[in-house]
């Protein structure tokens, strides 16, 4: 601040008539922290404490008998706590498919290297499709493990519900390296071309869009051409819409120009 500004400020203060009561209230208010900051802080602390208490209760429920297991499993489908993993793993062998399925989802929420092999065994051998579907989802959160090839096989051969989640998890499992991305993209491209379920084809498109930055030529061009082909020729509008969104999100000038040409020529609206 300049000398001139200081002088004007001093003169202005000298001419103020200050009400002592008002000044006292203002000074007291200045000692308080921002109420919004206090609310945010309190909410964060409350949520952390609540999660910790929920996890403690969940651990007790998992250990207090079969009648309470599902309640405990619901806790760890929502919260992460490494203490739960040793209690969840034995539940993968339970005779009740709901318990197995819930344990799988909880392990997806609480990924651990020791869970990979038991989950892969379920994906291969469990007779219940809902359990295998849960495994296909959960393995996407265990992408550092050897899950890529089993997910490819599930996308090739399993029921539609499992294929749906296998395609999504392949985007996670294939995103680690260029080689894995290429392997995952190969099966996703095949399934996009031949799978009978529109929702599976749509998920294949989504997964390919997630992987494309990891791919090298000529695979990258193959993916783009497959997306254009789906946009132009797939029988289901939902799949065509997914392909268009994926192509637009690539933000590649040549691809955007190509889409505009299709619009201009009347092939797209």
Where are these regions (language model features)?
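N-terminal "cap/leader" segments of large eukaryotic alpha-helical scaffolds
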Residues: 2-65, 70
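Generic detector of intrinsically disordered, low-complexity, polar/charged segments
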Residues: 6-9, 55, 105, 137, ...
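Structural detector for internal amphipathic alpha-helices that build alpha-solenoid repeat scaffolds
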Residues: 28-49, 67-82, 86-93, 101-112, ...
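Amphipathic alpha-helical scaffolding segments comprising HEAT/armadillo-like alpha-solenoid repeats
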Residues: 48-62, 81-93, 112-125, 144-156, ...
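Short, highly charged low-complexity linear segments
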Residues: 131-135, 162-165, 180, 229-233, ...
């Amino acid at each position: 601040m300049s000398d001139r500004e200081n002088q004007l400020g001093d003169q202005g203060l000298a001419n103020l008539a200050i009400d002592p009561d008002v000044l006292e209230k203002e000074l007291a208010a200045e000692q308080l922290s921002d109420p919004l900051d206090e609310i945010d802080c309190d909410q964060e602390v409350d949520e952390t404490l609540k999660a910790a208490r929920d996890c403690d209760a969940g651990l007790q429920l998992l250990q207090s008998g079969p009648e309470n297991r599902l309640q405990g499993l619901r806790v760890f489908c929502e919260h992460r706590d490494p203490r739960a993993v040793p209690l969840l793993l034995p539940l993968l062998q339970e005779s009740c498919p709901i318990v197995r399925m819930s344990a799988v989802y909880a392990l997806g929420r609480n990924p651990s290297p020791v869970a990979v092999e038991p989950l892969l065994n379920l994906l291969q051998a469990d007779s219940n499709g809902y359990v295998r579907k849960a495994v296909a989802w959960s393995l996407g959160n265990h992408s550092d493990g050897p899950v890529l090839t089993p997910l490819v096989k599930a996308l090739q051969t399993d029921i539609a519900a499992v294929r749906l989640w296998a395609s999504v998890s392949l985007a996670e499992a294939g995103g680690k390296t260029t080689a894995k991305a290429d392997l995952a993209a190969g099966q996703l491209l095949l399934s996009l071309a031949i799978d009978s379920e529109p929702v599976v084809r749509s998920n294949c498109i989504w997964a390919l869009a997630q992987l494309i930055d990891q791919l090298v030529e000529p695979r990258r061009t193959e993916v783009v051409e497959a997306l254009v082909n789906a946009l132009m020729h797939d029988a289901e509008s939902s799949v065509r819409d997914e392909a268009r969104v994926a192509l637009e999100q690539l933000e590649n000038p040549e691809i955007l120009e190509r889409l505009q040409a299709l619009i201009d020529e009347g092939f797209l609206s």
